[in-house]
Regions:
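Beta-lactamase-like hydrolase cores
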Residues: 26-71, 131, 136-140
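Conserved serine DD-peptidase/penicillin-binding transpeptidase domain
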Residues: 34, 38-40, 89-359, 473
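Small-residue-rich helix-loop
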Residues: 63-66, 316, 326-474
């Protein structure tokens, strides 16, 4: 298929160099639509803070270009690049495999030796999967394990546990990549209000030994939007979270999630609880290590397929899924110790060889967008969108984007006409969007837009004005 060439149109020039290629584009507007200008003015955002590029996918024409070659931080909209590269590099049916091995002898249901839990990079190995796999051990005849559980995380380099960009290390969105990640290293506390009794019932998942929770917290009047602050939760001790406030009356069930920093202790408590529930005696400990050469495989546990992970990554802007997808780009070339340098090399080759984007025009730092080191241009991002729209996996990819007014991060941003599959991005001082719009006349358009600087956080209306302008095209 002939490659489409993208070019930005400057205010005073037509047919300038973009992405290292020349091409004449017809019908491109180098001024902003009136409603977009009005929205910028109303929110006191300078027009120079905006970068936008819009391409008619049916005609391969740029219809709007404003600072389309300006390098900007994409925030989470870069996930569309990560997910498309993963679909094309690994395929939509790719699965991660978590391995269970042992290094001892098995006699009458007793394993005299260690059990190995070998991470295969599955970002969604959660409590239900551990329950299933422990019960698989039970079904295989295991009654007791005398040794330890050794967790092998060597598929990914240990350095991938990155520091939080905002200092909020206890928040799940800041979780670093881990080849043997379990349940996002998170505890989910559930609050179920009982209006008649004036209390909310409290419970926690996953099932763990040693965790202490109050059974209830009192209800009180308040604002639903401020339920967290009114609860006054303290999770500094992950085994004994406390709630010094009250739960807001009339707000329905809510969940509070926090990350446990000690991975081994978290997994140990989870294994202990699941082993006890399944009737397997185990009194050892969980420790990090490498699977020995003499270890024998018991079974492998397969993840969801990659297409499912892509959907969850984009619909809900899940950072840890994106990081695992990004690192997994290098798995066909490297069997262990995969790091972001390896992933960036694969990504850069794919962008150059497949998409036709010159080196360093798009820089992906960790795959998630939760980084100010990632850089893109509006023109390059619409080129990725145009390429992806022609990919054999275009359906899996585009359908993973949030739909305006319907789901994901675009649920509360409906379209007045037409429709949009749109991935958004947000960092302090940065707001972006990237996706596909189907206009009321039936044509499809690729769009990337970015706002940076003062009042960028107030820019939803500006980006929506761009979407509505595109949707009104014939």
């Amino acid at each position: 298929m002939k490659k489409m060439r993208l070019f930005s149109i400057f205010r005073h020039l037509i047919g300038v160099m973009a992405l290292g290629v020349f091409s004449p584009w017809a019908c491109a507007s180098s001024s902003l639509p009136i409603d977009v200008e009005k929205s910028l003015t109303a929110r006191q955002i300078n027009r120079e803070q905006l970068a936008v590029n819009v391409v008619d996918l049916d005609r391969s024409e740029t219809i709007l270009a404003w600072q389309a070659d300006k390098s900007v931080v994409p925030a989470s909209s870069v996930k569309i690049v990560t997910t498309l590269a993963a679909l094309e590099t690994l395929g939509p049916a790719f699965q991660w495999k978590t391995g269970f091995y042992h290094d001892g002898t098995i006699q009458k249901g007793v394993l005299k030796g260690n059990l190995y839990f070998v991470g295969g990079g599955d970002p969604r190995y959660v409590a239900e999967h551990l329950w299933r796999d422990v019960h698989t051990l039970k079904a295989m005849g295991f009654r007791q394990i005398t040794g330890d559980i050794v967790v092998d995380r060597s598929l990914f380099a240990t350095s991938q546990a990155s520091a939080a960009i905002d200092g909020q290390n206890h928040r799940p969105y800041n979780l670093g990549a881990d080849a043997a990640l379990f349940n996002f290293n998170s505890v989910v506390i559930r609050f179920i209000p009982d209006e008649r009794a004036g209390i909310a019932h409290v419970s926690a998942l996953p099932l763990q030994t040693g965790i202490q929770l109050p059974k209830t917290v009192p209800l009180a009047a308040g604002w639903c939007s401020g339920w967290r602050s009114q609860l006054r939760a303290d999770v500094s001790n992950p085994l004994k979270p406390t709630f010094k406030g009250t739960f807001v009356k009339g707000c329905g069930e809510r969940q509070l999630t926090y990350v446990v920093s000690d991975r081994e202790a978290y997994l140990s408590r989870s294994f202990s609880a699941q082993m006890k529930e399944a009737g397997i005696v185990w009194k050892g400990k969980v420790k990090s290590g490498l699977k020995t050469a003499k270890a024998n495989m018991l079974f492998e546990s397969a993840s969801d397929d990659l297409a499912t992970t892509v959907r969850l990554t984009n619909k809900f802007s899940n950072n840890i899924l994106a990081r695992h997808l990004f690192l997994s780009l290098a798995l066909p070339q490297k069997a262990s110790g995969v790091d972001y340098v390896d992933a960036r090399a694969v990504m850069n080759r794919w962008l150059v060889d497949k998409v036709g984007i010159a080196p360093h025009v798009i820089t992906v730092d960790n795959g998630s967008g939760l980084s100010r080191e990632s850089q893109v241009t509006a023109g390059a991002m619409t080129k990725v969108l145009a390429y992806g729209a022609r990919s054999p996996w275009s359906h899996e990819w585009i359908s993973s984007f949030p739909i305006a007014g319907l789901d994901g991060t675009m649920k509360r941003r409906p379209m007045l006409e037409g429709s949009a599959h749109m991935k958004t991005g947000l960092l302090s001082g940065v707001k972006t969007m990237a996706g596909i719009v189907q206009a009321s006349g039936g044509r499809r358009y690729a769009v990337f837009a970015s706002l940076e600087g003062k009042n960028a956080s107030q820019g939803d209306a500006v980006l929506d004005a761009i979407l509505h302008w595109i949707a009104s095209q014939n």
